[in-house]
Amino acid sequence: MGKSEFELSVDRFLRLIAKDSPKTLFNPWKDVNAQFDMKSAPSIRKSNLRQYLFAHENARAILVGEAAGWAGCRFTGIPFTGENLITGDEKLEWASGRPMKRSSLAEKPYKERSATIVWGEIAG
């Protein structure tokens, strides 16, 4: 059985965001910083974003951010989402049962303050 139109759209989107960027910019879905990232970090971030999009396939609205947060999307690949919200005790409900991974080399998961605020407001 072939992929759904949604799956094909997600695949296209992930290919687009992983394209080359100017050397002065860091693209979380393509680049690795050996000081902070696992070698497979871009693949992990794309996989995390794929899982997020599949979990919200029927969403009525989306949030769009202007730039990836330095301690959130930068490591998870998911806008407004820190590593603490996809793994461990603070894992968000939609992330449970999904193969979410951290991409940072840090001992503890990165926390993005704005991510905690955004998801707190969404949860009500």
Language-model features: where?
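A polyanion-binding, active-site-adjacent surface
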Residues: 3-124
